[in-house]
Each structure stands twice: as structure tokens, then as C-alpha cells.
Amino acid sequence: QDLPGNDDSTATLCLGHHAVTNGTIVKTITDDQIEVTNATELVQSSSTGKICNNPHRILDGRDCTLIDALLGDPHCDVFQDETWDLFVERSNAYSNCYPYDVPDYASLRSLVASSGTLEFITEGFTWTGVTQNGGSNACKRGPANGFFSRLNWLTKSGSTYPVLNVTMPNNDNFDKLYIWGIHHPSTSQEQTTLYVQASGRVIVSTRRSQQTIISNIGSRPWVRGQSGRISIYWTIVKSGDVLVINSNGNLIAPRGYFKMRTGKSSIMRSDAPIDTCISECITPNGSIPNDKPFQNVNKITYGACPKYVKQNTLKLATGMRNVPEKQTRGLFGAIAGFIENGWEGMIDVWYGFRHQNSEGTGQAADLKSTQAAIDQINGKLNRVIEKTNEKFHQIEKEFSEVEGRIQDLEKYVEDTKIDLWSYNADVLVALENQHTIDLTDSEMNKLFEKTRRQLRENAEDMGNGCFKIYHKCDNTCIESIRNGTYDHDVYRDEALNNRFQIKGVELKSGYKDWILWISFAISCFLLCVVLLGFIMWACQRGNIRCNICI
């Protein structure tokens, strides 16, 4: 399609930007729906379905809970002295020893999980006047009755159970975790049969704390043939402190201590299989990539993970505003320039030129403007990831029934944090998208102004992103405009001459209407003047008589 007013003595140069047939809708601060040429999804919404064992050291709990492994349940002996970054508890885990409860289960579980080890050191406790190593048919170790391997069930010796008073100092330079307990028989007869006294008491103290527990005799629901229970407690003995155990019966004594370590180990409930693969971020659903700043797979995470948000999708604009090319314009399509629409078919570039001159038509990219825009946009995704990825884990929170109000408060706090981060994510992405679109528009305007300053009076802005050049401009001339070496003085005289010649015969449509109306008005006025003059002349000659009647 020939451009208006184009001949061998003139040329047309249009500036335009990249466009695609089907763009991507993104959100900005000023517009909820704006189309761009390209965008990147920021929300990871699916997992691999498996837990990767690298770079984190994963310990599969299989059919054991962490607490059962800690106590030494016979079917969990394989976990003795194990270490982990993440302990994975399965839904099919079960206890297979004497029924027990842990009054502060969640705290103990979290404490041991964060320590990342079940390293156990046996100590030489002296229990005089009692029978050690009690067992139960509810806790078989092989064919024989057994018990938790990390605990020592003490019962009467003969017909006596003396008051026990044992001291164990911590002379090491690390903290020690002692696990102990108290037995609650189901009947008074069982109480006296095992411990002689009608009621037992256990006191465990350090310089910093003291716990006093009294046995609670009574029948409970039968579990593995037992209606009695054991309550498990724990005490941390700091370096330089002393552990003191005093009891007159019902004591489930420690055999040693667990070495406490500080670290970023954790625990997670999941039934996802463990596989040989690499992933920094783990959720109960499986590992997920952390190349996006946000995820909505699961609130519970371990490792360097995207921030959890409620949104299913958030798109970051990585391209410019998209204005699809009008396909009805023929060969040149969007020759009108960037003000009307974009240009499709531009490969690997964002900005460019199209021209028509005596040598034909052509198109070329402006790599400098393209690179300037790309350089500023490329780092956006990494910057958003740096702002949002958590370098720590979000663990499960558990509370006992008596801590219901605390649990409600914790849930409220977590939900509020998620709401806040979801809102922050929306605003952050909208701001970045607004900046991207403003940036790419600015680069287009810079290129247009640069071209205008070069051409000066040698060309006319056609108002649609194009310039009409009023001198012969071959391909070499066009190239000089594109690369910034154009010398307008060389063509100045020719351009002025051609401009006057063309303006003499070619009027802009905006002025043509005015001139037509003015010409029509003048013609009507002259016609009226001539007609009035003829009437007056005829009246003077007597050829026309005018009678006025009242």
C-alpha cells in the first residue's frame, strides 16, 4: 500500500514497537486489565508430588512417629542415633508399646525435631533397692515382654520400694535432654503390687525448675491389653546444672540423655514419596521449585520457599503494552506507527523503523532502545524473589485441648499474615507492572523524540508515529537516521523547496474543510451582491416596478 503523498522526491519513516496477536492480561496500579506482549507467572501452584532428598537430608519416619522413635518403641529401634534436616511423619505411623501420653507433646516434638538428631548417651544411674528393666506384654521385643529402650521401668524389690534420690550433674559444655515418666496403674491392687505404697510421687528438679507429679490411679480405655497409662515428661539440664530425681514409687526413669543441638531441622507430616531429586523447598504435597516468589500449594514449608499467598495467579509484565496490529492495512499493516498500533512479526526486538522511499519499503530494528528496556526489566523477577522467598521454614503448630484459646489466636495470627502477604503481593506486582509499562512507553517516546530532533524542518510529524520526509531519502539516508548520523543541513534546501511545492497542491484535510466553507460563503455573498445590484439597476431603468401596498 502506497503511503499518502509519497513519490520519488519524498519518503516516509515510521517508528513502531513489538506487538503480538494474543497478549497477556496483567494488573497495574491504574488498570486491573491491561494487555502486554509478555508476562511471567509468579505463583507456583503445583508440586512435584514427591519429596526430594537433596540438598536436605530427609528421614522417612515410615510407621513411627518422632516421639516413638525418641522413646525407643521396639518397632522404631532402626531410628536410634539418626540425624535429619527434615523428619517426615506418615499418616500410618502407630505406637506399639505400653500406652502413654505426653502432656506437652507439641513442645517436645518441636524441640526434638529442631535438634535434628536422636543421638543418645547412656549414663550410669544408680537405683538401689528396686527392680529395674520392667516390661509389658503390650510392648513385645521379639517373643519377650519389653519396654521403651530409652526408659527404665522401676518396680519394687521383694516387698519394699525405698525412697529414691539420685543426682546427675551436667559437667559437659552442652545442654542435655532427659526423658522420664510416671506410671498410672489401673487399680489400687496393681499399684501396691508394683510399688508397695498406695500412691507414688516423682519429683524432678534442677537449679532452674522443679516438676512434681503424683500417680493417678484409675482404669482407662484398654489399649493393647492395658488400661493403665504412662505419662512422659522431659527436663533440659543446662551445662553446669544438676539433675535431681526423687521418688517413692511409680518412676519411669531415664537411662541417659539426648544431646541437644541448635539448628534449622524440622518435622513435617506428609504421605508424599521420597525420591532422588533436588529441590530447596518442601511442602507436605511434595517439593516445589523456588524460582517464583509466591506459592499457593501449602502453608507448611521447609527450606528456601516462595511466600504463601491466597492468589492462584499473579502475572509480572516482562514485555510492553500490547496493541495488536490492524490486519486491514495491507502490506504495511501498522505503517501508521506506534501511536495507532504495534507491529507484529518483529523477532527478538521491541522497537524498530519502517520506511517507504524511491527504493521500496523496508524494516529495521533499533537494538539500542530494545536493550535499554530489556536491561531494566530482566532483573525484576529476581528482585521480587529476593524480597519474598523465606530462608526459613514454616512449621506445623500443634496445641493440646487445654490450649484451645492459644490455638485460636495462633490461627488468627497466621491467617492475618497470609491476608497481609496476599495484599502485599498484589500491590507489589501491580507496581512493578506499572513501572514496566511506563518504562517501555518511555523508551518508545525517547526514540521518537531522538528521530524528530534529527530531522527538524526536513520532515513533518504526521501525528501517528510517522514522519513525512520532504527530500529524496534512499536506503543509505534512512540508515543514517536510524543510527544517528543523519545531517539535516545536507538536505535542508531540497526539503524546503519540496515542502513549498507540495503544499501548493496538497492541502491537509484539516485546512481543506475550512477553505471549502470560506469559499462557499464568499461565493454566496458575491452572488447576493450581484443580484441586488441588478435589481437596483433595473429599477432605475424602469424595467422593474416595485409596488409597496399597506
UniProtKB/Swiss-Prot annotation:
<dbReference type="GO" id="GO:0046789">
    <property type="term" value="F:host cell surface receptor binding"/>
</dbReference>
<feature type="disulfide bond">
    <location>
        <begin position="97"/>
        <end position="139"/>
    </location>
</feature>
<dbReference type="GO" id="GO:0039654">
    <property type="term" value="P:fusion of virus membrane with host endosome membrane"/>
</dbReference>
<dbReference type="InterPro" id="IPR013828">
    <property type="entry name" value="Hemagglutn_HA1_a/b_dom_sf"/>
</dbReference>
<keyword id="KW-1167">Clathrin- and caveolin-independent endocytosis of virus by host</keyword>
<feature type="glycosylation site" description="N-linked (GlcNAc...) asparagine; by host">
    <location>
        <position position="165"/>
    </location>
</feature>
<keyword id="KW-1133">Transmembrane helix</keyword>
<comment type="function">
    <text>Binds to sialic acid-containing receptors on the cell surface, bringing about the attachment of the virus particle to the cell. This attachment induces virion internalization either through clathrin-dependent endocytosis or through clathrin- and caveolin-independent pathway. Plays a major role in the determination of host range restriction and virulence. Class I viral fusion protein. Responsible for penetration of the virus into the cell cytoplasm by mediating the fusion of the membrane of the endocytosed virus particle with the endosomal membrane.</text>
</comment>
<feature type="glycosylation site" description="N-linked (GlcNAc...) asparagine; by host">
    <location>
        <position position="22"/>
    </location>
</feature>
<keyword id="KW-0812">Transmembrane</keyword>
<keyword id="KW-0945">Host-virus interaction</keyword>
<dbReference type="InterPro" id="IPR001364">
    <property type="entry name" value="Hemagglutn_influenz_A/B"/>
</dbReference>
<keyword id="KW-1160">Virus entry into host cell</keyword>
<dbReference type="GO" id="GO:0055036">
    <property type="term" value="C:virion membrane"/>
</dbReference>
<keyword id="KW-1165">Clathrin-mediated endocytosis of virus by host</keyword>
<keyword id="KW-0564">Palmitate</keyword>
<keyword id="KW-0348">Hemagglutinin</keyword>
<feature type="transmembrane region" description="Helical">
    <location>
        <begin position="515"/>
        <end position="535"/>
    </location>
</feature>
<feature type="disulfide bond">
    <location>
        <begin position="473"/>
        <end position="477"/>
    </location>
</feature>
<feature type="disulfide bond">
    <location>
        <begin position="64"/>
        <end position="76"/>
    </location>
</feature>
<feature type="disulfide bond" description="Interchain (between HA1 and HA2 chains)">
    <location>
        <begin position="14"/>
        <end position="466"/>
    </location>
</feature>
<dbReference type="GO" id="GO:0019031">
    <property type="term" value="C:viral envelope"/>
</dbReference>
<dbReference type="GO" id="GO:0019064">
    <property type="term" value="P:fusion of virus membrane with host plasma membrane"/>
</dbReference>
<feature type="disulfide bond">
    <location>
        <begin position="281"/>
        <end position="305"/>
    </location>
</feature>
<keyword id="KW-0449">Lipoprotein</keyword>
<feature type="glycosylation site" description="N-linked (GlcNAc...) asparagine; by host">
    <location>
        <position position="285"/>
    </location>
</feature>
<keyword id="KW-0946">Virion</keyword>
<keyword id="KW-1161">Viral attachment to host cell</keyword>
<keyword id="KW-0472">Membrane</keyword>
<dbReference type="GO" id="GO:0075512">
    <property type="term" value="P:clathrin-dependent endocytosis of virus by host cell"/>
</dbReference>
<dbReference type="Pfam" id="PF00509">
    <property type="entry name" value="Hemagglutinin"/>
</dbReference>
<protein>
    <recommendedName>
        <fullName>Hemagglutinin</fullName>
    </recommendedName>
</protein>
<keyword id="KW-0261">Viral envelope protein</keyword>
<comment type="similarity">
    <text>Belongs to the influenza viruses hemagglutinin family.</text>
</comment>
<feature type="lipid moiety-binding region" description="S-palmitoyl cysteine; by host">
    <location>
        <position position="546"/>
    </location>
</feature>
<keyword id="KW-1015">Disulfide bond</keyword>
<keyword id="KW-1164">Virus endocytosis by host</keyword>
<feature type="topological domain" description="Extracellular">
    <location>
        <begin position="1"/>
        <end position="514"/>
    </location>
</feature>
<dbReference type="InterPro" id="IPR008980">
    <property type="entry name" value="Capsid_hemagglutn"/>
</dbReference>
<feature type="disulfide bond">
    <location>
        <begin position="52"/>
        <end position="277"/>
    </location>
</feature>
<feature type="lipid moiety-binding region" description="S-palmitoyl cysteine; by host">
    <location>
        <position position="549"/>
    </location>
</feature>
<feature type="lipid moiety-binding region" description="S-palmitoyl cysteine; by host">
    <location>
        <position position="539"/>
    </location>
</feature>
